[in-house]
Structures are given as structure tokens and as C-alpha cells.
């Protein structure tokens, strides 16, 4: 597909945020904050960067994305539905009996490559995909709290040792986890230097800025002349600085946004806030 205009990406992101709120108003609620922080990242990847075809979700030449932070599933579902992997109307079945849209991704959902949710395994899984076919790009989208799992760093060491220049890890750096700030749990800083010390090329961007994300994630940013792999064989880590709960001022950058089970009234109010923001941003 041709590169979408920023306005098209923004409109898609607004719809995805509305889908997230709708799913958090379902019977089981959902991980609101960490899904809202992911929206621009996944929107750019699925609509502007990855080589994918929703009509052929198992195509041999497709690019691969593994959502390491599987608790961000409702964002992934919203993006996949908007991209055409399954009907948008199916989002209303999220977490209901018999639905394939569960609280964490499963392979029964078109576009989902691996079941995730047990933190710390996404990068290792992406390593396997990248090693199996170096002619395609592979992405692991990781939470910053997830980086406190030792298995992430074992996988990071292997990525560089194996020369997986077709692999990109995107870190959702919203600085909050279920217990509070990441730096109060197990400090991650200096995060960029940590990745570099493991043999990775590192870029830091505003994770809500479409142009910045495009620049860091576009094929030419990883390989020469748009090829899948970097010539130097180094994997790329993109540290995307984000805001947990982005789009809803009442929960932005708040730990309590981690999980939400919204009442009908709360969901309606949240949707009204999102739609008002969308009108302001789209106004000439």
C-alpha cells in the first residue's frame, strides 16, 4: 500500500482509541493505559511500515510482529480490525464467551503470530522468526516493565550475536507498570546505553509522533536501499517515549490506568472526551 497521509494515520489512531475504550467497557475490562500508549506505534507499523496483506495473513513473504507486552491486546485487536484482518464489528465480542478475542493475543485471531502475555518471551520469539528468514523484517513490541525480565536480555544478547539485522525491538517507554514507576521497581536507565552495550543500534523517538516513528521504523532505517537487514548485522532498538493512558487526561500518566473495567457511563464519558479531542485536532 502507498504511504498514508498523517491525517489518515491520525484518524485511524483516534478510531483505535475509541475501540480500546469500548472493549474496556466490556464484561472483563481491559488493560487501558498500556494499550492507549501503544496506539501510534502499532498504527504506523501496520499501516505504513510492515509488508502485510490482510487477505493473506499467512503469506510466506509477510513481515512479522510479536507483541511481547501481550496485555496490550486490545490495542492490537483495534489496529488489526482497522487494517482489515477481521470485521470491526467483532470487537464488540471481546472477552465474551466463545469469542476469539481474549485478554491476551492468541493465534486464532488473524494477524496474531504468537500467543503472548507471559512477559519476557516476545523478543526470543521474534529472534526465531528473524533467524528463520532474513529476507523479511521482524518486530518485537515490548513494554518497559517487561524489560525487567532477565529473559529479555538473554534474547537481546542472542539477537546481536546472531547478526539479526532484520530485527527491530520497539520499546513502549511509558515509564509506568502495575505497581508504579518503572524506576521505583527495577530501574532501567540508562536504557539506551544498556541496549547499545548488548550490540544493538538504538534510536529514541516520541512514540506519539507519526513522522518520528516513520523515520525510525521505515525499511530504509534498518537496511541499505530498503532491504530487510542492516549491512552491519546489528538489530535495532527503538525506544518510543509514550504516555500511559494517552488520550484520556483523567488517567494520562497515572498508574491506575493500567487496568480498567469501565461502566457504561464511564465508557460513554471517555468516548465523549476522545471524540472532542478528535474534533479539535481535525479542525482547520
Regions found by a protein language model. Name each.
Residues 210, 216-284:
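Glycine/aspartate-rich loop-and-adjacent alpha/beta segment that forms the canonical ThDP
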Residues 71-72, 174-175, 242-245:
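Glycine-rich beta-alpha junction loops
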Residues 13-29, 172-174:
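N-terminal capping segment at the start of a domain
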Residues 1-16:
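N-terminal hydrophobic or amphipathic helices/low-complexity stretches enriched
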Residues 111, 115-225, 230:
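Thiamine diphosphate
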Residues 77-79, 106, 151-153, 179-183, ...:
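Short acidic, glycine/serine/threonine-rich loops at helix termini
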Amino acid at each position: 500500500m502507498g504511504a498514508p497521509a498523517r491525517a489518515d494515520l491520525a484518524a485511524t489512531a483516534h478510531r483505535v482509541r475509541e475501540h480500546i475504550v469500548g472493549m474496556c467497557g466490556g464484561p472483563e475490562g481491559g488493560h487501558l493505559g498500556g494499550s492507549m500508549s501503544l496506539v501510534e506505534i502499532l498504527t504506523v507499523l501496520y499501516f505504513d511500515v510492515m509488508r502485510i496483506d490482510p487477505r493473506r495473513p499467512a503469506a510466506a513473504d509477510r513481515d512479522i510482529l510479536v507483541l511481547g507486552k501481550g496485555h496490550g491486546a486490545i490495542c492490537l485487536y483495534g489496529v488489526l480490525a482497522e487494517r482489515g484482518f477481521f470485521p470491526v464489528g467483532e470487537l464488540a465480542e471481546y472477552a465474551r464467551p466463545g469469542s476469539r478475542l481474549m485478554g491476551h493475543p492468541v493465534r486464532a485471531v488473524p494477524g496474531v503470530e504468537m500467543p503472548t502475555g507471559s512477559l519476557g518471551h516476545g523478543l526470543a520469539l521474534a529472534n526465531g522468526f528473524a533467524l528463520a528468514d532474513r529476507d523479511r523484517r521482524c518486530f518485537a513490541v515490548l513494554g518497559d516493565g517487561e524489560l525487567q525480565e532477565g529473559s529479555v536480555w538473554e534474547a537481546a544478547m542472542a539477537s546481536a550475536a546472531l547478526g539479526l539485522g532484520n530485527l527491530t525491538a520497539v520499546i513502549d517507554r511509558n515509564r509506568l507498570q502495575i505497581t508504579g514507576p518503572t524506576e521505583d521497581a527495577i530501574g532501567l536507565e540508562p536504557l539506551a546505553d544498556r541496549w547499545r552495550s548488548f550490540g544493538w543500534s538504538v534510536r529514541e523517538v516520541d512514540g506519539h509522533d507519526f513522522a518520528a516513528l516513520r523515520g525510525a521504523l521505515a525499511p530504509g532505517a534498518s537496511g541499505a536501499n530498503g532491504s530487510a537487514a542492516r549491512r552491519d548485522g546489528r538489530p535495532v532498538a527503538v525506544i518510543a517515549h509514550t504516555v500511559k493512558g494517552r488520550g484520556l487526561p483523567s488517567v494520562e500518566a497515572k498508574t491506575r490506568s493500567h487496568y480498567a473495567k469501565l461502566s457504561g457511563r464511564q465508557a460513554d464519558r471517555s468516548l465523549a472526551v476522545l471524540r472532542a479531542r478528535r474534533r479539535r485536532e481535525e479542525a482547520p
